[in-house]
A protein has these predicted regions:
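Short beta-alpha junctions and helix-cap segments that line functional grooves
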Residues: 157-159
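Charge-rich, low-hydrophobicity low-complexity segments
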Residues: 1-150, 155, 165-170, 174, ...
């Protein structure tokens, strides 16, 4: 026979004595279970020590998520707080964060979407749709991507022929766009808009269309 395990309630956990000496533990807040010798607690950070894939499934968490691998193709990660990814975001993945998003490597794929209420920091972006309530800061380059930021969009000069450049795609930076090179002979048109949000631009296009119509009719 085993011996009783002595465990106490840690942070955000309430313990209640039940019948036959059984103790029940209840979480007092949303979060992830953290178990250490002799204690059980609930914390507001979910740590994934691997890639997000079939072993983990999609993630939806009320708090912060730290992923020590990459987010696999087609999987979804949602958090009310920040999301930190040590690796990359593969094609077709979706990420939604109520805070900031930091991606150690890059984002790739036309069906890939990243949305953050705060800022987004990423090594590079190729063909993905990234939208931020703050800045979008890219360490190397952006190619054929959609970038919408209420803050600044910045691409740093690093190493490699693509470094510091925005080539192709649609880029909106409400507070400005900072880069070394815009456009490329190898890509389609590069659309850059600074100082205006997309909805404002649509209204301006409609207004211009009305003015032109009035001039000719």
């Amino acid at each position: 026979a085993g011996r009783p395990l002595e465990v106490k309630a840690g942070s955000n956990v309430r313990a209640e004595d039940g019948v036959r000496g059984v103790t029940h533990f209840y979480a007092e807040t949303d979060g992830a279970i953290k178990s250490i010798p002799g204690e059980i607690a609930v914390v507001d950070t979910l740590v994934i020590d691997s890639d997000v894939g079939f072993d983990t499934g999609n993630l939806k968490f009320n708090g912060e998520i730290v992923i020590k691998g990459s987010v696999g193709q087609g999987f979804t990660v949602e958090a009310t707080g920040n999301v930190l990814v040590f690796g990359s975001i593969d094609a077709g993945a979706t990420m939604v964060a109520g805070g900031n998003v930091v991606i150690g490597h890059g984002i790739g794929g036309r069906r890939t979407r990243v949305v953050a209420r705060g800022e987004v920091r990423v090594g590079y972006n190729e063909e993905a749709d990234v939208r931020a309530g703050g800045d979008i800061l890219i360490g190397s380059h952006s190619a054929q991507a959609i970038l919408h930021a209420d803050g600044v969009i910045g691409v740093k000069r690093g190493e490699g022929p693509k470094s510091g450049g925005i080539s192709g795609g649609e880029v909106w930076g409400l507070a400005g766009i900072q880069m070394q090179v815009a456009g490329s002979n190898a890509h389609n048109m590069t659309n850059l808009t600074a100082g205006m949000d997309p909805e404002g631009a649509k209204k301006l296009d409609l207004l211009n269309g009305t003015v032109v119509a009035n001039l000719f009719f």
